[in-house]
Amino acid sequence: MNTGGRLIAGSHNRNEFVLINADESARIRSVQELSGQTCQICGDEIELTVSSELFVACNECAFPVCRPCYEYERREGNQACPQCKTRYKRIKGSPRVDGDDEEEEDIDDLEYEFDHGMDPEHAAEAALSSRLNTGRGGLDSAPPGSQIPLLTYCDEDADMYSDRHALIVPPSTGYGNRVYPAPFTDSSAPPQARSMVPQKDIAEYGYGSVAWKDRMEVWKRRQGEKLQVIKHEGGNNGRGSNDDDELDDPDMPMMDEGRQPLSRKLPIRSSRINPYRMLILCRLAILGLFFHYRILHPVNDAYGLWLTSVICEIWFAVSWILDQFPKWYPIERETYLDRLSLRYEKEGKPSGLAPVDVFVSTVDPLKEPPLITANTVLSILAVDYPVDKVACYVSDDGAAMLTFEALSDTAEFARKWVPFCKKFNIEPRAPEWYFSQKMDYLKNKVHPAFVRERRAMKRDYEEFKVKINALVATAQKVPEEGWTMQDGTPWPGNNVRDHPGMIQVFLGHSGVRDTDGNELPRLVYVSREKRPGFDHHKKAGAMNSLIRVSAVLSNAPYLLNVDCDHYINNSKAIRESMCFMMDPQSGKKVCYVQFPQRFDGIDRHDRYSNRNVVFFDINMKGLDGIQGPIYVGTGCVFRRQALYGFDAPKKKKPPGKTCNCWPKWCCLCCGLRKKSKTKAKDKKTNTKETSKQIHALENVDEGVIVPVSNVEKRSEATQLKLEKKFGQSPVFVASAVLQNGGVPRNASPACLLREAIQVISCGYEDKTEWGKEIGWIYGSVTEDILTGFKMHCHGWRSVYCMPKRAAFKGSAPINLSDRLHQVLRWALGSVEIFLSRHCPIWYGYGGGLKWLERFSYINSVVYPWTSLPLIVYCSLPAVCLLTGKFIVPEISNYAGILFMLMFISIAVTGILEMQWGGVGIDDWWRNEQFWVIGGASSHLFALFQGLLKVLAGVNTNFTVTSKAADDGAFSELYIFKWTTLLIPPTTLLIINIIGVIVGVSDAISNGYDSWGPLFGRLFFALWVIVHLYPFLKGMLGKQDKMPTIIVVWSILLASILTLLWVRVNPFVAKGGPVLEICGLNCGN
C-alpha cells in the first residue's frame, strides 16, 4: 500500500485507517497536489485563504471543495465531506452552524453511511489495549507497499491485504494469549470510509434532506446560476455543459431517498391521546375523592369488613398507577424497507446489510414436536435476507437424537423449500402453515409453473412429514442400551444430564447447495455440555452458550431469538429490524427490536386471553414512547454488544450559547471561566483519545516518538480483565471487541470447532460475569425480564416494531390447565426477581433507566402480589350476602355521584385505550376476565412457591408447556396434574353463587324493604361471577362436565368456609342488642 510519505494511523471513532502528514515535506506535497484544482461540486476554482494557502475544507482527505460550497454544505446540506463522509469542522472565518461540536449521534447520516455497528466507548478502549498489538521491530523498516503475512489460527496466508485487519489469535501455549493484528478479507465486512459509488461525480448526488423536493429545487437553481457565470467566463473545464443533464439524472432522487432515515415515529393523534391523558388526571382526582370518602366513612357495625375492603382498594389503586402511567406517551413506528435497500444493497456490489445469527431453543422433542421446530427452521432459512448474512443455531438442551435426526432431514428438505419460496415470493415460509391456510393461492400468481411446482412441493412436504412422524414414533421406544449412530457409535446424549458438548454444521460453508445451485444459510446444531454438580440455568444458560458458539463460528453483530414454536410469518422481519438497528441517526443506542407475539390455532372467542392483545397493542406501545418495550422472550433482534454488557453510547451535553446569543455583561463574567473549563475538558479528552489509538504504530506528540511499552503493559492488564469477564477462550475474547462482527475467513474450521466446543463446556462460565452482567441474566425462570432490564439500566433503549404483516407467529396453550401453568411460570419468575437484588424497586439507580420505564418494571414484578387482595376482595361479596352487612355505609347522594363517576372513568379509560390502541372490546374484556382468573389461581400459587424457593430453598421444577396441535392426549393429563391451580377460583365461584342464593332467599322472606340494600351486594357478587365465567367454561371442557375431584374439593372447602363464617362472624359487633328507652311508659 503506497502511503505517499504519510503515516498510517487509526480512527477509533470510525474503525478505519487514515493517512496523516507526518512531516512538513509531505504536508507541502499534499497541498501542492491540490493546486489548480476546481471545486468538485460547483466547478469554481478553489481560492486561497488570507494566509496565501489553498483552501482545504476537509482535513481528512482534502477533497477539493470551494469555500462557498463548503459553507453552503454546512449551512443547508448534510455537513459532511462528500468523499470520506467526515463531518466538516468549522474553519476560522466561517460562521457557526447548528451542530458544531455536538455528539456524533446528531450528525447527518452520511458520516456513518456504512457504519452499522455500535461503537461503545470502552469497547474501543478494549480493542485498543488488549486485542491488537501495535507491532515492533521489522515492521518499522518495511517498505510502504510490502505485504506482511501474519498467522491465522493454524496456518499462514500472504495473499491478504495489510491495510485491513481482523483480530486474530495465534497459537500459543503460554498463559495469557496475546492478540495480534492480522489481515482480514471477510467480504461480509462493510467497507470503511469510502464513497458509495466512486466512479460517479459527486455533483450527481445533490444535497439530501428530509424535505428533498424543496431543497433540491433551490440547489439546482443556485447551481444553474453558477454554471451560467462559468460558461460566460469560459472556465467550465469541459464540465459546464453537462451539469444540467447530470442534475436531471433520474437516479438522483433514488440516491437521495437512500440517505433518508430508515424509520420514523408516528405519535398517536392528539384528538385521541389528549382526551385520554386528561381523563387519567380526572380519574386520579376522582380516586382521591373516593378514598377521602371511604376512609372518613367507616361502617361501624362491620368495621373489619370495611377496613379489609379499603386496604384492598388502596392496593388496586397503586397497581393501577404502576400500570397506567407507562402508557402516557404511546407511539407507533413506520419503517422504509426501500430506503434500506437503496442504502446497503447497491446493484452489482456485495450487500452491505449486517449479518444476523438466529437462535432457536428447544428442550423436549416429545412436548415440542420436531415438526413444529422444523417449520420454524425452514422459515428462517427461507427468510428474505442475503444467505451469506444468515446463520441459524438450534440449541437442543435435551440432547435428543430425535431432534438431531429431524434437523438433518430438515436441512435436506430445505434444499427444495428455500428456492421455491424465493422464486414465487410466498408467505408465510413455514410449509405447515403455508399449505394449511385457506386462501386462493392462484391470486396474483401469474407464473405458469407455479401451480405445477406448488403441487410437487406439497407432495414433497407430505413425504417430509411422514419421515418426521416416523422418527417420533421410533423415539417413543428407547432401547435399554440407548441410541447409537449409523456407524455403531453410541449417541453422546443418551444420558441427558451427563453428556459432552455437541456441534454439527448441517448447511452453510460445507458446500451443500439448494436444487438451483445457490448457497444456503448456515444451519448449526448445538447441544451444550452437561455434567452432574453444575447449575445449567435452564434456557438462559442455553442461550448464553449459543452466544459464545455463534461468536466463534460467525460472530454476526446482531442476534435474533425465537422459540421453537414461533416461525417467521413475515419474510422481511429481519429487514424490518435492520431499519432501526442500522439507522445511522438513531440506531446506535438501540439494544434490541421487539416484535409483538401473534398466535395461530386460538379459538375465535379466545376465552383465556391467549392473544394478550391488550399487552402487545397498548402497553408495549406506551413503553415504546419512553425507553422501549420490555423483552418478552421471543421474536427479538439484539445488538450483540449490548448483550455483552457494554454501556450505551453516552450523550454529550450540547454546547453553551455563544457570545452572539448572550448579553455582553454575561460574557465578561462567564467567558474566562468557561474558557478554562473548555481547555481542561479538551486536555482530558485528548489524553483519553490518545490512550485509545487502536492501530497506532507509535504515539506522535509534537514530533517526539514515544515507545509503546506502556501500551503493551496496559494491553496485558486489559487482556486479563477481559478473560476474567468473558472467559478463558482467547478467540471468543477477540471476537467480543469486534464492533461490526466477523471472523477470519482463512481460519481453519477444525480450530474453530475445537474452540466452539470449549465455550459450551459446563465449567466455562465459572468465575466469569456470564449470567450476572453478560448475556441472558440468571436468577429467574423469566430470564427475559431480567435481561431487558439490565440493558435498559446500561442506558440502552429498545424499539417496538409492529409491521402490517405479523413478523412472527406461534402456538399458544389450547386448554385452561396449560394456560394457567404458563401464567404460573411467568408469575413465579416475577416473584423471584422481586426477592432478588435485581428488583427494580431498589436496583439500577444512577444508570440510564427512566422513571416511567422503572414503573413498568416494578409493575412486572409486583403483580403476583395482587393475588392476595384480589382473592380477599372477590370473597367479600359472599361474606356480605351471608351476613347481611356491606363494605360501605348507607350511600348518600354525594357518595352515589362519586361512585358513579368512578365507574364511568374506569369504563371511559378503557374505551379510549381501545381506540388509540386498535383493540376490540372482546379482547379488552377477555383480558379483564383473565386478570381475575389468573390472579385467583396461578399468581397465588406462584407467590407461595416463590417464597418457598427463595426463602426456604424448596425448588419447584416445571415441565415445558406442550406445543402439540392436538390436545386430546394431553388435556385430561394436565387437568388432573394441575388440580390445585383450579381449586381457588372454583371455590370463589361456589361461595359467591351460594351467597347470591342466600341473599335472594333472605330478601324474599323479609319482604319488600330488604330488596333495596340487597342490590348493591348482588351487583358485587355478580361482578365476581361474570369475571370467572370463562374459567367455568374451561373446566367443563369438551365433556361439558367438571372433573369430580375439583367439584368435591371446592364444595367441601366452600362449605367449611361458610360454616366457619356463620360460627365466627368476625365483622359483626360482639355485643348484644342495643336497648334504648323508647319514651313510652309501658307500665301504665
From Swiss-Prot:
Enzyme Commission designation: 2.4.1.12
Modified residues (N-acetylmethionine): M1
GO BP term (any one): cellulose biosynthetic process
Region (Disordered): 230-259
Bilayer-spanning residue ranges: 279-299, 302-322, 868-888, 894-914, 930-950, 980-1000, 1012-1032, 1042-1062
Record's bilayer topology term: Multi-pass membrane protein
Tissue expression summary: Strongly and ubiquitously expressed. Localized in some dividing and expanding cells, as well as in vascular tissues.
Active site: D397, D784
Main location: membrane
Necessary cofactors: Mn(2+); Zn(2+)
SUPFAM superfamilies registered for this protein in UniProt: Nucleotide-diphospho-sugar transferases, RING/U-box
Subcellular location: Cell membrane
Residues bound to UDP-alpha-D-glucose: S361, K367, E368, D397, K538
Positions of Zn(2+) 2 binding: C58, C61, C81, C84
A matching Pfam family: Cellulose_synt
The protein's annotated pathway: Glycan metabolism; plant cellulose biosynthesis
Coiled coil: 451-477
Class of the enzyme per the UniProt entry, highest EC level: transferase
CC annotations in GO: plasma membrane
Reported function: Catalytic subunit of cellulose synthase terminal complexes ('rosettes'), required for beta-1,4-glucan microfibril crystallization, a major mechanism of the cell wall formation. Involved in the primary cell wall formation.
Subunit comment: Homodimer. Interaction through zinc finger domain.
Name of the featured protein: Cellulose synthase A catalytic subunit 2 [UDP-forming]
The organism of origin for this protein: Arabidopsis thaliana (Mouse-ear cress)
